[in-house]
Amino acid sequence: MTNQTQMMEFLLVRFTENWVLLRLHALLFSLIYLTAVLMNLVIILLMILDHRLHMAMYFFLRHLSFLDLCLISATVPKSILNSVASTDSISFLGCVLQLFLVVLLAGSEIGILTAMSYDRYAAICCPLHCEAVMSRGLCVQLMALSWLNRGALGLLYTAGTFSLNFYGSDELHQFFCDVPALLKLTCSKEHAIISVSVAIGVCYAFSCLVCIVVSYVYIFSAVLRISQRQRQSKAFSNCVPHLIVVTVFLVTGAVAYLKPGSDAPSILDLLVSVFYSVAPPTLNPVIYCLKNKDIKSALSKVLWNVRSSGVMKR
């Protein structure tokens, strides 16, 4: 196999060669995946069913849950299947689709997190005009811009990557198809399209980071002017988790895409990939919704209705 037209499949790296640990990995990833899917589906359904959860903040949370659901479904099930079936292969077309989805979904998540920071700025710094500032039309426009931007960049990344010539080796140093891992297999010296794609991606991520930082500078300035300690504490508790999520997501993504490549995968490389592809979809529902009174109230209402309907049938 000398180029990508003859490359029929790729081999994904295993977390371990030990048979017992491989099954343990499959079990752990299965639990993580089922937990993430269940939590994100519940959040989406609650926000659709309860009219109180139709504000801008919940609009973004609903779409974030949808993105998280898609992102973890793009990578984890294949890793679980390979561990259970004791195989490492992924088809060429499967790799193309997986790469496109990861770039699209991860990038769109950055856009949503940026929009959420602006929504928090509007809620804290302009509380009387929040609904006017974060109108339904603006929310839809921000969402569409994020999807279109990352969709175009995803196509550019995917087309640029698979237009390159590959070595005879088809072993990826990653548990899913990702640009850095694929570039290690290429024998092409010129990566012009990829270089342009990375530059655009870095500019996009940096501009999102700047918007988030500026929003939080205004937010923390406004919070520090609040006289009541209880209200200050509540505002900080709502904002700090979001800031932590953004920081971890951007830092791990930057490390994965910008650090120099190595000849063999390290456990650190795999952990970094887990942090930006598996951890966010699992942790976001907990971070954003566990202490949210409106969501807890909506869940209690749904459970009560289900229980009441069951009693009535009896």
Swiss-Prot record:
Keyword Glycoprotein annotated: yes
Extracellular-side positions: 1-23, 74-97, 153-194, 257-269
Gene: OR14K1
Pfam families named in the record: 7tm_4 (PF13853)
Keyword Nucleotide-binding included in the entry's annotation: no
Cystine connections: 95-187
InterPro entries: GPCR_Rhodpsn, GPCR_Rhodpsn_7TM, Olfact_rcpt, Olfactory_GPCR
This protein's GO CC annotations: plasma membrane
Cited function: Odorant receptor.
Organism: Homo sapiens
Taxonomic lineage from the root: Eukaryota, Metazoa, Chordata, Craniata, Vertebrata
Locations listed in the record: Cell membrane
Key words, A-Z: Cell membrane, Disulfide bond, G-protein coupled receptor, Glycoprotein, Membrane, Olfaction, Receptor, Sensory transduction, Transducer, Transmembrane, Transmembrane helix
Protein known as: Olfactory receptor 14K1
Side of membrane Cytoplasmic, spans: 45-52, 119-131, 216-235, 291-314
GO MF, one annotated term: olfactory receptor activity
Annotated membrane topology: Multi-pass membrane protein
Residue positions the entry lists as glycosylated: 3
Transmembrane regions listed in the UniProt entry: 24-44, 53-73, 98-118, 132-152, 195-215, 236-256, 270-290
Family note: Belongs to the G-protein coupled receptor 1 family.
